Amino acid sequence: MLLVLDLGISSLVLVVSLVLPLIGLFVRHKWRVAAQRREEIRRLLIHASEEAARAELEASVEFSSVAVSNVFHCPVCYCLATTRCSRCKAVRYCSGKCQIIHWRQGHKDECHPASIVYDSEDESDSDLRLGEENGQNTPEETLLVGPEPVTIPIGESLLSNRARSPEDGNGDIADNKDDLIDKEEAVSVAETSGSSFSGFSSSPRNDSGDEISRCESFSSSESERSESLLDAHVSVEPEDTCFSTIEDAPSKLLSPKFVHLVESVDNLANLPKLSVHKPEDDAGQNQSQSRSLHSLVTDRHPVSADPSLKSSDFWGTALGSAERVSDSCVKSKSGRPGNSSLHFSFGSGSSRDTSAAKVSEQRSSILKEAPRGTGYISDGVNLRERNAKRFDEAEIALPISSSTDALSPLDSSNLSHVTLPKSKSASSENGSMLAPLKVGEVQLLASKASNTKKCADLMKHSPLGAKSVRVLDHQKQNGAVVQHINSLHGRSGLKASVLKVVDQWTRPKSENEMAGRHGHKGLFPYEVFAKLYTYKIEFQPCGLINVGNSCFANVVFQCLMFTPPLTTYFLQQFHSRACTKKEQCFTCGFEKLVVKAKEEKSPLSPNGLLSQLQNIGIFLGNGKEEDAHEFLRFVVDTMQSVCIKASEYDMTKSSKLEDTTLIGLTFGGYLRSKIKCMKCQVKSELREKMMDLTVEIDGDISTLDDALRRFTRTEILDGENKYRCGSCKSYERAKKKLKITEPPNVLTIALKRFQAGKFGKLNKLIRFPETLDLAPYVSGGSEKSHDYKLYGVIVHLDVMNAAFSGHYVCYIRNQNKWYKADDSTVVTSDVERILTKGAYMLFYARCTPTPPRLAVCTKTEASNKKSRVPLPKANEKSTISRSVSTSSPELSSNTPGGGRSGNIQSFYSSFQRLQKILEEDSASDSSSLFDSNSDECSCSTDSTSMDDFADFIFGDHQGRAHGQSETPSPTSSSSSSSPPFTRRSPLSRSSPETYGTSRHQLPLGGER
């Protein structure tokens, strides 16, 4: 019998045949994965190198040297320009095609005929300069009013291009031929343009030293070309001094303006008299001449002979109250009472000999029959802007006669200025819309009279530092008494500046002024802001279509739509109603998006806003992966610049106005940085503007509170980060500490999930609360409530843990309901799930809005006036700022010495209150009243002891309170001018502590 022996070879073969293929498949899979990883790393390295090269190229372009000034480039294609705009002469092109493209892009809204530009490079409260005061021969000015032109002497230096670029600053560039063409076309356009304006032509003349004068011509915007509305003759009359001192001259020059005379709803009840005044200095005395423009009215606008005809309250609309002054208070030199006149006064700071040049000897016969004794300003003379920027500041003298009211006459030396807020208000009566009034200062001119008394209760300082006063209400004018205090008198300029501080601290801010600030588009009243902030509105988010890597913009737009004050503001369409450039305005485009999102439920396309990205930032463009945090900063900065431009104020001299815009009240806050040198123990302190916070989350940080504690803890500056000490003149080790001094109403926190030189993303979970208490990180935070509520979260979804690629989604809250917005998809969500997300940006809204400290600092409570406060110690030193208050309060008294004790008590009460506010920064060892680096007020180097205060208050303040006038000295004159503010845009001086890192540190990019 055969025996079969099984050696197990078949089983071994079976096992080997099965295991070896499996091993081969596994090795092959591993090899493929490794190859894919190597390819991905190679791709990432190539991408990173391209990004670095592009960043270096952009940085080199950004910091390249300025081009030669005599080379002009086309604004469209940046080629060498060979021609220029035939109308404004300001923009140069390489061809007519580029000119047409630029015209359609928006130049048609900015192009204005060449006109006079008044240079004001060195402005102060005591000096005015017209153009370039070089004393050369002056040409003549042709005023196109009526059928025949009238020639008036004018300074040659005043003829310059308004919109000339900085490269055109040298006078050697423009040739004589271009200048001749400019002047000829200015006259031709004045004769043929659809909106008529003043044209000027120049011709040589001899050295006569005649005064530099300016006139404005008015024409109706609704008149037919064949019908003349206005006929005028110009004459020169000697007049009394327009300004008693050089300090009374206006502090800002006028911009040239093409204004129009609109048809009156009252059929021109009374026609004012237009005159031009100019102060001159001759042998220590002020002399002036007035150039009067006696206007005639055609049959289309008959002059009513009824003096009792009431106007439509033009000034009441612009200012909130109607103003009426008696003719007995303001008399002309000729002694003719009852002449109602409207004076346009232009001051010149140059001193030269003057001679009266008779321009026209004939006067209008209709003017003699014009009614006299009218006490109101007719609405027939309304200023409507047309095709140009409006007046920066215009001075209008309003001596208006009245046969019913009798006031004491004004002394000619006591000229008072009334500051009118530049508003854009318009009201309608009888179907007529009032045009925006662009007036900077209104001057109550007074002529010499036998009896001199003080007529009205005035105040001296406006919110912008100009010498101005506010006219009392019509009900208070009959028995009012003027207290004209010469702030430049005294034995020293220091006491004069202290007097100004006393005047400002002892007078409360009226509610009318706060309400009047709403007339400024860029000065947003806090009361209105608080109402918008706390207003509840039901608003469900609407999806936004991704138009090509636009998820970074969609999440920012969604969060801004639900920012508390902006939601109501844009839904009410407040901005678009006042904006003049709706097509090119980014804020108007965003407002349209918010309104459509409220009305429609289907997803919207943000393509209209994204097309303007090149106007927002140099690094942003369509189809590119961008960082949401960087884009948010650009959007906020753009909206802030729109508010600032709309306010039409020079922010370098009024930098505090940045905090009073809608965006400033919403996102604006302040950080304080303290650095102490460890070698010399010298401390330095810097206060910076803050629009958001960027906090580090690396290391052992796991919560938002940990990140904020690291942000505000003391840091040692050593190694490459050594501090350059100004005392040691070398780099030394130092201690640095950051603190939030003024937290914003809307706090935006960016978690720094990227690092310089690394491509990976910090994909760790950072827990954040729904309600944030910011008090531990705020200087003096225990005295106020700093509770914030979460309303928006932006999350970055990365691809392979990369920081420069991925996708953005956001979570937003409205009426305690949370929504998730993923481009065009919007679904509901819950807060528990949101708090566990890897957030990149957090949006917190303050539970109770708080005004800026600047407004709190300048407010004076009525109870503080009645309380007695002990005087400070005599040995205490303090620095007094020359321009502390931003309000324009009143200093009134019915008796010559009345209210003196209350003023002193209120002064020291305000002194201690301000000192207490500044002492909230308890870590500061500075003993001065105002820190030199503080943005609370302007800087000053004057220091005085309380002995000087006592000498000032009990010495010559009594004479000032009685309104005694003295001759101002040059020293006191120079000490009254406020030092100019120099400040850049908040985002232009960003620091890593304030705004996070720059684009070169690879922020998070977003894409599908």
UniProtKB/Swiss-Prot annotation:
One Pfam family linked to the record: zf-MYND
InterPro entries listed in its UniProt record: Papain-like_cys_pep_sf, Peptidase_C19, Peptidase_C19_UCH, USP_CS, USP_dom, Znf_MYND
Subcellular location: Membrane
MF term (GO), any: zinc ion binding
Top EC group: hydrolase
Transmembrane segments: 7-27
Main location: membrane
Biased composition (Polar residues): 284-295
Segments of skewed composition (Basic and acidic residues): 222-233
Membrane topology: Single-pass membrane protein
UniProt GO BP: cell division; flower development; leaf development; protein deubiquitination; proteolysis; regulation of response to salt stress; response to salt stress; root development
Binding-site list for Zn(2+) 1: 74, 77, 94, 98
Upregulating conditions: Regulated by the transcription factors NAC045 and NAC086 and up-regulated by salt stress.
Comp. bias intervals (Low complexity): 193-203, 340-351, 878-888, 965-992
EC number: 3.4.19.12
Annotated segments matching region Disordered: 122-149, 159-178, 187-233, 275-309, 326-379, 859-905, 952-1008
Binding site for Zn(2+) 2: 85, 88, 107, 111
Catalytic activity: Thiol-dependent hydrolysis of ester, thioester, amide, peptide and isopeptide bonds formed by the C-terminal Gly of ubiquitin (a 76-residue protein attached to proteins as an intracellular targeting signal)
Keyword match Transferase: no
Null mutant phenotype: Exhibits reduced salt tolerance. Reduced shoot growth in response to salt stress.
Active site (record annotation): 551, 807
USP domain sequence ranges: 542-847
Tissue-by-tissue expression: Expressed in flowers, siliques, rosette leaves, cauline leaves, stems and at a lower level in roots. In roots, expressed in the sieve elements.
Family: Belongs to the peptidase C19 family.
Stated role: Recognizes and hydrolyzes the peptide bond at the C-terminal Gly of ubiquitin. Involved in the processing of poly-ubiquitin precursors as well as that of ubiquitinated proteins. Involved in salt tolerance by modulating sodium transport activity and repressing cell death at least partially through modulating SHM1 stability and activity. Involved in cadmium tolerance by interacting with HIPP27 and probably modulating its stability.
Name of the protein: Ubiquitin carboxyl-terminal hydrolase 16
Upper classification of the organism: Eukaryota, Viridiplantae, Streptophyta, Embryophyta, Tracheophyta
